[in-house]
């Protein structure tokens, strides 16, 4: 065993800590914790030595004294797929610590494991990730509570473009803040965040998308993402490539905001790719990764000194960040040599004095966590989230606003539906009298009404869940709401349109075509058309969640549509269906609706005009003759209505299950 190994304090995980060289400190003791940054800051704003923080371990709380995040011997494996479910190690025995007031840059070449390490430390790793090692924040193992005490700013900004900045922050505040926060307090928090992030003038501006005339700029969208994460005043903030896609001025303003947060005691970890020299100077700590291993941890100035001591000198007037990343990167054509060079630096850092100082801090933090019970646990557990029904209400209200403000989803379809009702009514006007030709016209009008409320509504919702799936996954991982709340809220937001739209359609179409003028016939027809549209939409939602893309969903849905159309009862009698397709009649809402609407039109009709009858072309004399022609039974009307209600809930249950399963896998 080497000297460095023999001097290392071997402290186990908090649940099984053993006492070796450290003396257990009594509760209430104050100890000086060594800082990982013992060098002057490169930024001109702070050229003096940083004072070493003092922590009273009897008052260890996330709000009063910040958060210290430590991890030891951390290995992270991800599933790379294949029949054998092969696991690939992304992070290799990483150890580190971040103290309150630290703005740390996590750097490395592409594929070095930056995002994987940060998402693991934030307890936001993807499903299927295997984590080994110890990760603690203020002496407590990380867990789902990290979503409450930390913020995570993703590289790509996901918003609902139809909402304004103020509306988005309002919705997020309702979902993130403690239920005991009053309306006035919530308003003041949002106003303060708008002022801090420079978004006060854009509060009423819609976030927008690429097709909108007035949208937020890239810098404003990034600041809005920061404002959302700062709502619950996190003690630790994780930022994944926060400057990506921003111009130099916006990037500088953003990093300046991070610097100010760190000065107030927030612990901040950022992955950053090729920052400018000016941006790099704002970070008081840097961690370099190479193929999942730690190549250096410490101040930027010490990083340059460490590399220089091993033969890598940064040229004059050269960006230090580019130099450090370039040394650890893999050069095309020299892959093996580049990897050996990077691994050599990792090996040298592992036995350096900086690594020993880091290990001492990590072991000390883990050991001191066993000195007593700290208020940190109490403060974490005292958080009271929003009640489930309020979460559901917020998600439903947001989905409803999106539908109302998106013309492609609601208003254009509504206008199209009214236009089609007038066209259909005009085509069948005066043709539905009780005669032999009238029978064909009535059945044709009924089928058109069914098909018009089947195909377009069903295909129009195929993009509903795939379009919002990335945002849904991000927010559910943050614990804002559940899969069931999200699915039910979106369906409930669709429901008013799914009732009003077919009702207006059937009112216009029914009276223009001159169908049977009895309350019973109209009522059954209206209920059938409303149910047809809702069942078709439910089927579309099921296929929307069952497949990853709209083209794939359509590829499977189109053949099923043809089967339902053929078995609707107008093209072929149900009794004559082949045995292989006998089951389709139980799933065909078009058949249920056609039978019920036909029965409502012809039951009780005793006289149908027949001008000429022959053996080859017999006439329909009564309404019962029409029902017998299609093998329909007037006693099945209410059964068919209930069957369509059952299909509606059945398709939605399948849709929810598919969405839940997809979310669980990712």
From Swiss-Prot:
Gene3D superfamilies for the chain: P-loop containing nucleotide triphosphate hydrolases
Reaction catalysed by this enzyme: L-kynurenine(out) + ATP + H2O = L-kynurenine(in) + ADP + phosphate + H(+)
Organism field: Drosophila melanogaster (Fruit fly)
UniProt entry keywords in alphabetical sequence: ATP-binding, Cytoplasmic vesicle, Glycoprotein, Membrane, Nucleotide-binding, Pigment, Translocase, Transmembrane, Transmembrane helix, Transport
Name of encoding gene: st
EC number: 7.6.2.-
Class of the enzyme per the UniProt entry, highest EC level: translocase
Subcellular location: Cytoplasmic vesicle membrane
Family the UniProt entry places it in: Belongs to the ABC transporter superfamily. ABCG family. Eye pigment precursor importer (TC 3.A.1.204) subfamily.
Extracellular side: 439-444, 512-518, 573-639
Residues that bind ATP: 108-115
GO cellular component, one term: plasma membrane
Protein name: Protein scarlet
Entry coiled-coil feature ranges: none
Span list, region Disordered: 26-55
Tissues expressed in: Expressed in the eye, specifically in primary pigment cells, secondary pigment cells and retinula cells (at protein level).
GO biological process, one term: transmembrane transport
PANTHER family found in the cross-reference section: ABC TRANSPORTER G FAMILY MEMBER 28, PROTEIN SCARLET
Gene Ontology molecular functions: ABC-type transporter activity; amine transmembrane transporter activity; ATP binding; ATP hydrolysis activity; ATPase-coupled transmembrane transporter activity; pigment binding; transmembrane transporter activity
Primary location recorded for the protein, binned into one broad class: membrane
Reported consequences of knocking out the gene: Eyes are scarlet due to a defect in brown pigment production. In larval Malpighian tubules and pupal eyes, kynurenine uptake is impaired resulting in a severe decrease in 3-hydroxykynurenine production. In the head, levels of neurotransmitters histamine, dopamine and serotonin are reduced. In addition, in lamina photoreceptor terminals R1-R6, numbers of synaptic vesicles and capitate projections, which are sites of endocytosis of vesicle membrane, are reduced.
Residues of the ABC transporter domain: 69-316
